[in-house]
Amino acid sequence: MNVTDLPNAIFLMGPTASGKTDLAIALCQTLPCDIISVDSALIYRGMDIGTAKPTAQELALAPHKLIDIIDPALSYSAADFCRDALREMNDIVARGRIPLLVGGTMLYFKALLEGLSPLPSADPAIRAELEEEAARLGWQALHDELVRIDPVAGARIHPNDPQRLSRALEVYRISGKTLTELTQVQGEGLPYRVHQFAIAPSDRALLHKRIEQRFDKMLQSGFEQEVRALYERGDLTPHLPAIRCVGYRQMWDYLAGEVEYDEMRYRGIVATRQLAKRQMTWLRGWPEVTWLESGESGNLARVVARAGVA
């Protein structure tokens, strides 16, 4: 099929605090678009303030798919995202509208665009086995095992990253092949004509300032109470992906008495800036993307003109 015969989709990517949501809502008021969130933190229920989840007013203007879809105790993989996003995209197109995918989780965008490698599904029995070994021997011993069987993954994955470390070992124990071997097998690409845009301020100091202001606004809006409710549930730990989200891990440490309030605030801002830096690193190497300056009045018209879907 010729690429011009494929259905249209728009990607609006960018670091945290870059103005993606405002532009996305404006696009929905201009084009027949429906928003799909591409954010590994917005998927969790009960995590609204620290994730800067769209407000009720914003959601009334432009509903978002794939937010508030799972409990923080559960995990959600890039494969889960691809399955859910493609289902939503196909549904949107079937209604004669355009999927507008908005967010900053670049791994999700990449997986959706290029297709995922054929990795085996999680195996609870093997996960439990690895957890038991880690409790008995320590994560460093498991990391040493990974280095022996898959030096490339071992060099990339830190011993203090139990989620990724256990996944790499799990893949090997299930399939007999290393994570490095399997990820070299390309999946199926996205059957859409994708128009890709990245929005960010060109002045890094401005982005840093916006991040600091946003974090302080979260603190003023009840972020501590939000995380305390999660903390007091009793079934959540700092090792879960939800609690490892930027801001939540730092507030969790504060509630556990491990750091003072001012240190928590400082660490939360630094962690958010580091996240933005990683997002920008991804985007600078992203092919076929049109860059937009945060806050520029002509961004809406530029997206409409470039996408050519009006």
Swiss-Prot record:
Q: Give the InterPro entries listed for this entry.
A: Dimethylallyltransferase, IPT, P-loop_NTPase
Q: How does it assemble?
A: Monomer.
The entry's function note states: Catalyzes the transfer of a dimethylallyl group onto the adenine at position 37 in tRNAs that read codons beginning with uridine, leading to the formation of N6-(dimethylallyl)adenosine (i(6)A).
By sequence similarity, the record places it as follows:
Belongs to the IPP transferase family.
UniProt name for this protein = tRNA dimethylallyltransferase
Species the sequence originates in = Aeromonas salmonicida (strain A449)
Question: Looking at the record, which segments are called Interaction with substrate tRNA?
Answer: 39-42, 163-167, 244-249
Q: Where is this site: Interaction with substrate tRNA?
A: 105, 127
Gene that this polypeptide is encoded by: miaA
Gene3D superfamilies the UniProt entry points to = 1.10.20.140, P-loop containing nucleotide triphosphate hydrolases (3.40.50.300)
EC number(s): the record gives: 2.5.1.75
Cofactor or coenzyme needed: Mg(2+)
Record keywords: ATP-binding, Magnesium, Nucleotide-binding, Transferase, tRNA processing
* Pfam families reported in the protein's UniProt record: IPPT
Asked if the keyword tRNA processing belongs to this entry, the reply reads: yes
Superkingdom of the source species: Bacteria
Query: For ATP, which residues are the binding ones?
Result: 14-21
Query: Which one GO biological process term can you cite for this protein?
Result: tRNA modification
Q: What is catalysed by this protein?
A: adenosine(37) in tRNA + dimethylallyl diphosphate = N(6)-dimethylallyladenosine(37) in tRNA + diphosphate
- Which PANTHER family does the protein's record reference? TRNA DIMETHYLALLYLTRANSFERASE
Q: Give GO terms: molecular function aspect only.
A: ATP binding; tRNA dimethylallyltransferase activity
Annotated binding of substrate, by residue: 16-21
